[in-house]
Amino acid sequence: MTTNQQNAVVSQPQTVVVKLGTSVLTGGTLALNRAHMVELARQCAELKKQGHSVVMVSSGAIAAGREHLGYPALPNEMASKQLLAAVGQSRLIQTWESLFGIYGIKIGQMLLTRADLDDRERFLNARDTINALVANDIIPIVNENDAVATNEIKVGDNDNLSALVGILCGADKLLLLTDQKGLFTADPRKDPNAELIKEVKTIDDTLRKIAGGSGTTLGTGGMATKLQAADIARRAGIEVIIAAGSAPNVIFDSLSSEPQGTRFLPCEEALENRKRWILAGPAASGDIIIDDGAVNAVVGKGSSLLAKGVIKVSGDFARGEVARVTNSHGKLVARGISAYSSEDLAKIAGKHSKDIISILGHDYGSEVIHRDDLVVIQE
């Protein structure tokens, strides 16, 4: 590492979440690339030596399981993936333990599912565990618990999981390492004129269209999921970097003034803790479709959502559960905790607040979603 690199790195201690995808850990093969993994461990160790904290979100359990079992021919279904994850997770963590041991660093394993993030108390318990590991100079290595997770309780990919982990531990930076150099103006594998986007201040529909499709055969995340993760994290005040995992010193350079890859600047006004949980934790149980006037009030003015602005309700959710708020064209504009069940809300949609008690026979307040329980997604 050069003197210029060392001088460029911020001196104030920071917490960095490093997400390693399957393609990074395998180098595009079907097996874990231990030579590359030890280099990644070395870079994390270098960060810790400089006084920073590191939290790792590591894919690779399924790849490790497939390698250990001799690449069996299994049907491409959840039961097969759970089998491979059950076999491979222990192999993966053993590999990380031995590699970090070279640098005298202890690790701790955390396996999470969506259910751990949906429930506020379990969310806080997970946060406390990660913070305790970090405080005791241990690197948490997090993965989704694929061996038991079903579609209903899966986060779905480790890109989004890493954003949620970043919120859990109050990270300063989230580094999403992939097999690409960053986000390009077009798919660089198909378009030779594609250019790397160095910095992003706002994530809009144009960027989402550029991000496009899915990931590799062994992995579950493509550039689109990385953009989703970046959007979640930056709203919580976390700077996000998408970069190539194979690039020299890419982890250490994430703290420099000119990091490799694509840098996503955090939102100027970071969400408070409760709203971070609403954004990161609960899976939405249904949709509340609102009219243009309500969109303007919620997004433009930061107002609470009233029944008058609700067009209709989709899905089934109870009072106190999180729902998606969309405009009349189905575009997501917010997430929030509904004061009314979907059944009740369907009855009072489009009605004045003063009429709620006469319609339902009870009243939980004039707001369908109070602004303190509402997180605006649209920018």
UniProtKB/Swiss-Prot annotation:
Key words, A-Z: Amino-acid biosynthesis, ATP-binding, Cytoplasm, Kinase, Nucleotide-binding, Proline biosynthesis, Transferase
Residues binding ATP: K19, T178, D179, T220, G221, G222, M223, A224, T225, K226
Cytoplasm recorded as keyword: yes
EC number(s) from the headed UniProt entry: 2.7.2.11
Pfam family, any one: AA_kinase
Segments forming domain PUA: 285-363
TM ranges: none
Record field: catalytic activity: L-glutamate + ATP = L-glutamyl 5-phosphate + ADP
Gene Ontology biological-process entries: L-proline biosynthetic process
Similarity comment text for this entry: Belongs to the glutamate 5-kinase family.
Function text: Catalyzes the transfer of a phosphate group to glutamate to form L-glutamate 5-phosphate.
Protein name: Glutamate 5-kinase
Organism (species): Vibrio campbellii (strain ATCC BAA-1116)
Gene this protein is translated from: proB
